[in-house]
């Protein structure tokens, strides 16, 4: 029988966390990643589960996630080490039948626990399940360097930030036509920032935490990584533009509209209406 470490979901988490570290997005224990699974995904690996799974109560019940398994990164764990010891740095957890807590079925060895941002992840999963009819399964948080840098120099509002990212790279409007949500600065690891992030996730697949990082959501690990990677590439272009004296020309409103029509997406109206 195949070991769980060779499963598609453990291998996918290893690749995503390794790639994110190589990108420079996840220094030290920065960043966290969760993937919503189905019972059928984990059923072949019950022999690998802990004999006495630890139970941890959630700070607030999440009945929408009842009986749902997830694979998650651990609190205080370094992304660069996931590939070296998946069972120490990742965990498969399953929310209980009333959504009040979860059991750690596999991994998170040596009394480790899931990421401190689990409230933000689970609340965001709930919103993205509703927003996408269950298609979105991944929530990824990382410290994408250039996106963070832009939060210091651009006005932190959704229409402006979205419009500038669309202008920074032609593919951006196609990849995230719903724009980028932005929070005020908040203390991380709290229910409050989790609730605020989830509220923005009702409308946007990308949410910026100013001076901190970004949250992204998507149907697969590849799609979610690619979403953040696309926004971060545009942010890198913008950082270079602003360091060279600013834009002399850019993609116009009319061109953005034409781009949306060509690829069958509806651009965020408030970003289009800016100028």
Swiss-Prot record:
InterPro entries membership: Aldolase_class_II_sugar_metab (IPR050197), Aldolase_II/adducin_N (IPR001303), Aldolase_II/adducin_N_sf (IPR036409), Rhamnulose-1-P_Aldolase (IPR013447)
Task of the protein: Catalyzes the reversible cleavage of L-rhamnulose-1-phosphate to dihydroxyacetone phosphate (DHAP) and L-lactaldehyde.
Q: A Gene Ontology molecular-function term?
A: metal ion binding
Give the cofactor binding note. Answer: Binds 1 zinc ion per subunit.
Q: What name goes with this protein? A: Rhamnulose-1-phosphate aldolase
Q: Which NCBIfam families match?
A: PRK03634.1 (NF002963), rhamnu_1P_ald (TIGR02624)
**Assembly and oligomerization:** Homotetramer.
Gene this chain is encoded by: rhaD
Under the heading Pfam families, the entry gives:
Aldolase_II
Q: Which GO terms describe its cellular component?
A: cytosol
């Amino acid at each position: 029988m195949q070991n769980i470490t060779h499963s598609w979901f453990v291998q996918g988490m290893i690749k995503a966390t390794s790639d994110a570290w190589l990108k420079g997005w996840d220094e030290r224990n920065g960043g966290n990643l969760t993937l919503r699974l189905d019972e059928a995904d984990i059923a072949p690996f019950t022999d690998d589960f802990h004999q006495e799974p630890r139970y941890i109560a959630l700070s607030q019940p999440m009945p929408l996630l009842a009986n749902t398994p997830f694979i998650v990164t651990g609190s205080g764990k370094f992304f660069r080490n996931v590939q070296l010891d998946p069972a120490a740095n990742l965990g498969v957890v399953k929310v209980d039948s009333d959504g009040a807590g979860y059991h750690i079925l596999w991994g998170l060895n040596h009394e480790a626990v899931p990421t401190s941002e689990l409230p933000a992840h689970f609340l965001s999963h709930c919103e993205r399940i509703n927003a996408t009819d269950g298609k979105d399964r991944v929530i990824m948080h990382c410290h994408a360097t250039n996106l963070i840098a832009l939060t210091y120099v651009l006005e932190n509002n959704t229409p402006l930030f979205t419009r500038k990212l669309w202008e920074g790279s032609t593919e951006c409007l196609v990849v995230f036509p719903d724009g980028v949500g932005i929070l005020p600065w908040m203390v991380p690891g709290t229910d409050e920032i989790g609730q605020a992030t989830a509220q923005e996730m009702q409308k946007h697949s990308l949410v910026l935490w100013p001076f901190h990082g970004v949250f992204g959501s998507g149907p697969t690990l590849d799609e979610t990584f690619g979403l953040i990677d696309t926004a971060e590439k545009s942010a890198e272009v913008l950082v270079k533009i602003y360091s060279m004296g600013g834009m002399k020309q850019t993609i116009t409103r009319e061109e953005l509209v034409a781009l949306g029509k060509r690829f069958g997406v509806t651009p965020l109206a408030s970003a289009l209406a800016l100028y």
